Amino acid sequence: MNNSPLLVVGLGNPGPKYVGTRHNIGFEVAEELVSRSFGSFSVHKRSNTDIAQLPGLIVAKPRSFMNLSGTPIRALCDFFKISPANVIVVHDELELDFGSVKLRQGGGDHGHNGLKSTSKSLGTKDYWKLSMGIGRPPGRMDPASFVLKPFGKQELADIPIMAADAADLVEKHLQQG
């Protein structure tokens, strides 16, 4: 990592309709990181995001829909002069069991449109991805429908634990530089 801050972007969809859905788990992690530092989000108009500036860290929640996440992420990188190597994108991941949390650098998008948009806008796949396992949809349910559904009651109880685990990984990554 260079001297620029680490940019952590929690992916999700804007608006009350999507609160508590699987696709918005990235927002949960962003909020956990900010609450740990007693910070708060404010609107960053240039990038159309809500951001919190913390020591060595900028946490963001795009105000765009998931499939267009790359544009605000690129705007933040340009504004704060952050290279893709200093970006962590937090996203829902169908290919991981529910409750699993995994940090990886580079690699594919696993069909995730928010990651596709980010890779296209940044011009590289070489940024960090913090994958939040939401599991596969039941039966023959369409994955696109599954990610837009709210978590079940039992799952909902585990979201704070997952968000805390993910925030721990970000803090460890920040400390290791």
From Swiss-Prot:
Site (Stabilizes the basic form of H active site to accept a proton): 92
Site keyed Discriminates between blocked and unblocked aminoacyl-tRNA: positions: 13
GO biological process terms held by the UniProt record: protein quality control for misfolded or incompletely synthesized proteins; rescue of stalled ribosome
PROSITE patterns per record: PEPT_TRNA_HYDROL_1 (PS01195), PEPT_TRNA_HYDROL_2 (PS01196)
Protein task: Hydrolyzes ribosome-free peptidyl-tRNAs (with 1 or more amino acids incorporated), which drop off the ribosome during protein synthesis, or as a result of ribosome stalling. Catalyzes the release of premature peptidyl moieties from peptidyl-tRNA molecules trapped in stalled 50S ribosomal subunits, and thus maintains levels of free tRNAs and 50S ribosomes.
This enzyme's EC code(s): 3.1.1.29
The species this protein was found in: Corynebacterium glutamicum (strain ATCC 13032 / DSM 20300 / JCM 1318 / BCRC 11384 / CCUG 27702 / LMG 3730 / NBRC 12168 / NCIMB 10025 / NRRL B-2784 / 534)
Protein name: Peptidyl-tRNA hydrolase 1
GO molecular function, one term: tRNA binding
Main location: cytoplasm
NCBIfam families: pth (TIGR00447)
Location relative to the cell: Cytoplasm
InterPro entries (UniProt xref): Pept_tRNA_hydro (IPR001328), Pept_tRNA_hydro_CS (IPR018171), Pept_tRNA_hydro_sf (IPR036416)
Active site positions: 23 (proton acceptor)
Highest taxon of source: Bacteria
